[in-house]
Design a protein with these regions (language model features):
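Extended, non-transmembrane interaction/recognition domains
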Residues: 128-261, 265-266
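Short glycine-rich, low-complexity/disordered patches
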Residues: 77-89, 203, 258-272
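Intrinsically disordered, low-complexity proline-rich segments enriched in Ser/Thr
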Residues: 9, 13, 80, 117, ...
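Intrinsic-disorder-associated interaction segments
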Residues: 54-57, 61, 183, 231, ...
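Alpha-helical oligomerization segments
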Residues: 251, 255, 259-314
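N-terminal chloroplast transit peptides
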Residues: 1-40
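Short Lys/Arg-enriched alpha/beta "domain-start" segment
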Residues: 35-140
Length: 314
């Protein structure tokens, strides 16, 4: 079985977006819930069920979502206002299912929004794709990179991992940016750790644009264990390597978000906004516009994608 992806991105899937009516981006001022209340709500949602994942894959997702909830939670994030029919959705036959959880940042927070999702797509040829995604986007008031985690199970013995802090500046023109967010944080050691495993190989996206967006320390790899231990070895790699590495990179990113950060002037802010908008628009165009209606039908696709476009503000 082969998997071909153009751009794993900060969208909840590797499908598509249509021209849909734009929703107001005004963010409702819900009363802030305690961290425990927020955890109870998200744990009771379809998102945290992960019915199709192996234990190590599920534990990795729970770790990352819990880290966001615990450390950002009430001080930075509004409660999710995703409608119930978008929080969990499926096609008519139930062969394609998905969840979507989004929390936008409060006005005073550098967080624009955080997003978590999973997709289960049964294939006509047999088997299924299971796509899990967690993303954190920042406002233009800071130049902190965006966070992106995506783990795709193409088969019990074949995974694709995309884990990166996505740069928001051209690193060639901004060597200080490279030093602050990538060299001083020693992100390269995580990529090198995975690279030492014989089952892990670099994954080259068919999209040249995507390759340009990824940072120098970005992890874009395939994990293939078709010889010997097979599925058991895949689970071991997730448990012993992918999970701790993902947790460490999430911790580094959250530390950046809640730290003092870099004061961004008006001119630089406009440049950041333009770059962020272009990346979001391209991600929607490449990953969402064509395949989601095929997988879920037009009505479901329009409903889900309308919410995504609203949050992306594109």
């Amino acid at each position: 079985m082969s998997c071909t992806f153009h751009l794993p991105c900060a969208c909840p899937l590797a499908p598509a977006i249509l021209l849909a009516p734009k929703i107001s981006r005004a963010r409702p001022s819900f009363p802030c819930r305690s961290s425990m209340e927020n955890q109870q709500l998200i744990r009771g949602s379809k998102l945290m069920g992960f019915p199709y994942l192996t234990g190590p894959h599920r534990d990795t997702m729970v770790d990352l979502i819990s880290a966001m909830e615990n450390r950002l939670g009430c001080h930075h994030l509004l409660p999710s206002s995703v409608p119930p029919d978008v929080e969990h959705y499926q096609n008519e036959s139930g062969t394609s299912q998905g969840t979507l959880h989004i929390r936008c940042g409060i006005d005073s927070s550098p967080i624009d929004f955080v997003l978590a999702s999973w997709l289960h797509l049964e294939l006509p040829t047999g088997g299924a794709l299971d796509i899990t995604n967690i993303a954190g986007y920042l406002k233009s008031s800071t130049d902190v990179p965006h966070f992106q985690f995506e783990l795709v199970k193409c088969s019990p013995t074949f995974l694709i991992l995309f884990l990166d802090l996505i740069p928001r500046k051209d690193i060639v023109f901004s060597p200080d940016y490279l030093k602050t967010y990538y060299e001083d944080t020693q992100l390269e050691k995580f990529r090198q750790r995975l690279d030492q495993l014989p089952e892990v190989q670099a994954y080259f996206s068919s999209s040249l644009y995507f390759r340009r967006v990824v940072s120098p320390t970005g992890i874009v790899v395939s994990i293939k264990c078709e010889d010997g231990a097979g599925p058991e070895r895949v689970e071991e790699i997730i448990r012993e390597h992918v999970r701790p590495i993902s947790n460490d990179i999430m911790r580094i990113w959250i530390d950046m978000c809640v730290g003092d950060g870099v004061e961004v002037g008006e001119t630089e802010r406009a440049v950041l906004e333009k770059r962020d908008s272009l990346i979001k628009s391209k991600a929607i165009e490449m990953d969402l516009s064509s395949s989601m209606p095929k997988q879920f039908g037009q009505e479901v696709a329009d409903r889900v994608l309308r919410v995504i476009k609203s949050v992306y503000n594109v």
